[in-house]
């Protein structure tokens, strides 16, 4: 983030604009909507600025800029075609720690103007950090078509009820949930129909019948990593959460989509490294929900595929707590799709089997290796890097060919995705450089990746 979006209260604050042309006029017209006390410094004014000055809406200083003019100024804008003057304004402002914007000279800007959608008091600001102003304008136009004109008056009406709601509902999280119910329900529908009195009565009715909320748990699959693969329902619940418990496999891009004010607890589950035992996670989910909170349990991939989501919900259900499940795209589906490897194919694989490397211990008889070694199927192994030698040994012993195609996919669907292709004979070598998380794909379908890979590069070992 190159620029932090801030909303400045300019009411009754002094803003100095250096320049009297059309560009300065456009900036001043925007500033006038904020209630700022505006001074313009210029030896001459364009017709529009002259009209504004004549109406006594702004103060005109008809002389050359002097550094002393920045005294008692909150921020300054320079919009002249004199590069030396613009530079002087910026340097003087910097020396006084005053925000400055030099039009069309980004290196001389301590703040920049965004594209604005004004539905006051709702204001949306869009910025490209000065890189693509036309793109920012196009985005603004799209948002203009989405936001109804009544959204501003609706926000004003809601504001008149805030103190009363605070007095009635003291818990911040419960109060937020009350407003979510109001704004997503009949109230908003009545506003859209222009029935303002009925809408206000709806708030009053909801408040009169208000009861303390009951907590719940949402088990949400975050998908394999790419934030674009998160489900819409998962995003909605993450935006409504009071608290989120998340794992190691949840990408930073996904976490950025969680509601800003939601508490976050890392319960990192990584092969051999559990920051919190499973029993404690189960207990924590129950404890938080019993406090009346909206709890989101966020897991990488799909929570019901090697995610122990079932165990967690058994504990929640046993406590009588309401819950729901939002499936996610499991790593086997997401990572192989991004690597151009179809899990099934009419010519090469009629079935697919998912297992984890934890089950592949050399001394374990848990797995049916004869079944896993069959041809015409795809074998996907989660967390299999540590057991690569055992996997190779077992599959070869039960009939899989040395030249069976193998893919090692690390950090699937992410920008730094790595796909290394070789054969079963090379499996241990292929996994040496693998970054976590890693999937092993074993089967003839791997050959197709060279034809339909579309994301990132594939390294083919000889």
UniProtKB/Swiss-Prot annotation:
KW Nucleotide-binding (keyword) present: no
Positions of the catalytic residues: 247, 269
Residues at which NAD(+) binds: 22-23, 43-44
Pathway assigned in UniProt: Cofactor biosynthesis; adenosylcobalamin biosynthesis; precorrin-2 from uroporphyrinogen III: step 1/1; Cofactor biosynthesis; adenosylcobalamin biosynthesis; sirohydrochlorin from precorrin-2: step 1/1; Porphyrin-containing compound metabolism; siroheme biosynthesis; precorrin-2 from uroporphyrinogen III: step 1/1; Porphyrin-containing compound metabolism; siroheme biosynthesis; siroheme from sirohydrochlorin: step 1/1
Pfam family, one: NAD_binding_7
Gene3D superfamilies: Cobalt-precorrin-4 Transmethylase, Domain 1, Methyltransferase, Cobalt-precorrin-4 Transmethylase, Domain 2, NAD(P)-binding Rossmann-like Domain, Sirohaem synthase, dimerisation domain, Siroheme synthase, domain 2
Uroporphyrinogen-III C-methyltransferase: region residues: 215-462
Sites where the protein binds S-adenosyl-L-methionine: 224, 300-302, 305, 330-331, 383, 412
Record-listed E.C. numbers: 2.1.1.107, 1.3.1.76, 4.99.1.4
Family from the record: In the N-terminal section; belongs to the precorrin-2 dehydrogenase / sirohydrochlorin ferrochelatase family. In the C-terminal section; belongs to the precorrin methyltransferase family.
NCBIfam families hit by this protein: cobA_cysG_Cterm, cysG_Nterm, PRK06136.1, PRK10637.1
Protein name in the entry: Siroheme synthase
Organism of derivation: Baumannia cicadellinicola subsp. Homalodisca coagulata
């Amino acid at each position: 983030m190159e620029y932090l979006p801030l909303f400045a209260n300019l009411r009754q604050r002094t803003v100095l604009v250096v320049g009297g042309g059309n560009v300065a006029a456009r900036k001043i017209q925007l500033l006038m909507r904020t209630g700022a006390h505006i001074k313009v410094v210029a030896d001459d004014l364009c017709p529009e600025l002259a009209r504004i000055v004549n109406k006594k809406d702004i103060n005109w200083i008809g002389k050359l800029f002097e550094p002393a003019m920045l005294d008692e100024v909150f921020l300054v804008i320079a919009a002249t075609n004199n590069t030396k003057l613009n530079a002087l304004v910026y340097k003087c402002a910097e020396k006084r720690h005053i925000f400055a914007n030099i039009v069309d000279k980004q290196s001389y800007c301590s703040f920049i103007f965004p594209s604005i959608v004004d539905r006051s008091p709702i204001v949306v600001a869009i910025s490209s950090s000065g890189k693509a102003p036309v793109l920012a304008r196009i985005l603004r136009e799209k948002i203009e078509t989405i936001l109804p004109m009544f959204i501003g008056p609706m926000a004003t009406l809601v504001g008149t009820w805030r103190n009363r709601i605070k007095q009635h509902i003291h818990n911040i999280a419960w109060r937020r949930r009350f407003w979510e119910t109001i704004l997503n329900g009949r109230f908003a529908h009545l506003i859209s129909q222009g029935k303002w009195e009925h809408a206000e009565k709806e708030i009053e009715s909801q408040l009169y019948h208000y009861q303390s909320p009951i907590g719940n748990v949402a088990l949400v699959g975050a998908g394999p990593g790419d934030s674009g693969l998160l489900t819409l329902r998962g995003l909605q619940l993450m935006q409504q959460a009071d608290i989120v418990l998340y794992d190691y496999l949840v990408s930073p891009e996904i976490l950025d989509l969680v509601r800003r004010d939601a508490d976050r607890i890392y319960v990192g589950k990584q092969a051999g490294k559990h920051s919190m035992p499973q029993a404690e996670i189960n207990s924590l989910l129950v404890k938080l929900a019993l406090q009346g909170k909206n709890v989101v349990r966020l897991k990488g991939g799909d929570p019901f595929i090697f995610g122990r989501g079932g165990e967690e919900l058994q504990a929640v259900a046993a406590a009588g707590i309401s819950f729901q499940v939002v499936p996610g795209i499991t790593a086997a589906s997401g990572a192989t799709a991004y690597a151009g490897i179809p899990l099934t194919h009419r010519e090469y694989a009629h079935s697919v089997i998912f297992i984890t490397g934890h089950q592949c211990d050399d001394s374990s008889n848990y797995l049916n290796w004869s079944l896993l070694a069959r041809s015409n199927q795809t074998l996907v192994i989660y967390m299999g890097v540590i057991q690569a030698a055992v996997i190779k040994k077992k599959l070869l012993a039960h009939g899989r060919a040395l030249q069976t195609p193998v893919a090692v996919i690390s950090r699937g669907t992410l920008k730094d995705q790595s796909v290394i292709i070789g054969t079963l004979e090379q499996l241990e070598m292929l996994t040496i450089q693998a970054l976590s998380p890693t999937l092993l794909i074993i089967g003839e379908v791997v050959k197709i990746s060279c034809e339909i890979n579309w994301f990132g590069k594939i390294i083919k070992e000889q």
